[in-house]
Amino acid sequence: MSQESNDDSLGIDKLSVDYDYLLYKIADYVSSIEFQTNQICKRQNELITKDIVNGIVDENIKHFREILTKCEKLENYFDMLDQINMITENFKTRLAQVARDYKELQKP
């Protein structure tokens, strides 16, 4: 009987080795899946973060362009004011000349 237990007639030792090997393969497979899942999640996170950052950057660029457009319009308004100032200065000079001419005509 002791020899039968040494011979492992029921195959318990082999079953134990097979079981351990199966657990090892399962753990290895789970680790592989975990690694791939982590890589995919990291990549997705990078894409989302990058897209969010890019979206924010794109939105900021859009706002800066709008501000730049407003600044250009403002600059045009100042140019118009300068032109109006030149016209009014010229008009004042001409009006003063007309007033002098009128006074000359009024003299007897």
From Swiss-Prot:
It comes from the Eukaryota. Keywords: Cytoplasm, Transport. The keyword Transport applies. It is found in: Cytoplasm. One of its GO terms (cellular component) is BLOC-1 complex. GO terms for biological process: endosome organization. The keyword Chloroplast does not apply. CDD domains: BLOC1_CNL1. InterPro entries: CNL1 (IPR034455). Its main location: cytoplasm. Component of the biogenesis of lysosome-related organelles complex-1 (BLOC-1). Belongs to the BLOC1S4 family. Component of the biogenesis of lysosome-related organelles complex-1 (BLOC-1), a complex that is involved in endosomal cargo sorting. This is Biogenesis of lysosome-related organelles complex 1 subunit CNL1. It comes from Zygosaccharomyces rouxii (strain ATCC 2623 / CBS 732 / NBRC 1130 / NCYC 568 / NRRL Y-229).
